[in-house]
Amino acid sequence: GGTTTDVVMIAKGRPIAAPVGAVVAGHETMVSAVRAHTVGIGGDSRIQYLPLSNDPLSIGPTRATPLVVAAAERPSLITVLTHQLDRNLQRETDGVFLWIRDEIRLRRGLSQAEDEVLAKLGSSPEGMSLHDIATNRQGQNAINRLIGAGVVGISTFTPTDAAHILGVDKRYPIGAAAVGGKLLARQLDRFGNPLAANELEIAASVLQRVRDQVAETILTAAADQDALSEIQLSEVLKAQRSQANLTGRPNRLKIAIGVNGQVALVGAPAASLDPTIDGKWVIDSVIPEHHGVANAFGAAIGDIRLTHQITISAPRRGLYRVHLEEPLNFYDLQRAKQFAEESVDARLRSEMHLAGGVSC
């Protein structure tokens, strides 16, 4: 999707559920639901430049409007970014464009810094560059709070822009993406070297990193089905990365990891974020026809499926306890099973009727 990537295992045409529910950013939700593994990365993931970090590019989990999308609605964006590119000196704030989305949502409780940000943005309906609004950390923190509250919109370089530069996504004109890619490529790492030689190189780097994160999420979901921990999987992935960084001599050890069975990729960025493109992972991917609208179409035609489980325990020989709101004891297993099934049937019929069922 645009903001997240969700991975689920399908068995007999249904997603597998679990009592502990989904896993979001490595944390179990502890709510009985589909066992989905979710990572905050997608076509609209915000790419942030971190000049003092070992890794100067951070991708996700927050989102931003892709430059190609924002430029279609706000023509001044390309003009602003082009002026930044024409300067000989790069700034950390280059390539970030902001506008007011919904000032009404936050009328009270604003700090002075937030008031100042909204006042500046209010003077330009189409939006302004980050540098023109805030040049210090206090102002940038205020902007981040307003973005989080949905008051201020942000556009910056995203994987969607990278896909447009490389020609794997052709939905929008690439002008804004190309300028944004050049601005990002000329930023410096902590050693003073440009991040990339040009916009093509930075775009390829961004998409490769996103594909790797998608692949690792798929592997995590597969490992979870095999009752392997993320720690065990991470050791293999760590060794694979270390080997990939070795240069100057051939590798004697071949490290390959993948998934048994096919992986179906759906969502608008499926083709551009397919993790099997470079052959690094042993994953057999399938991209269905109309994959771009599969999520929306599935939601529109999807059926409602309700499930209930009732536990029957045996505290001692010959005693069978059916665990409902109030546990009931039986001395015959078949009678206990029959009662449990009848209780579940009545509950499901009632809930399906409330959900709109007409023949429950």
Feature annotation, model-predicted:
Residues 1-360:
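N-terminally biased helix-coil "hinge/interface" segments that flank
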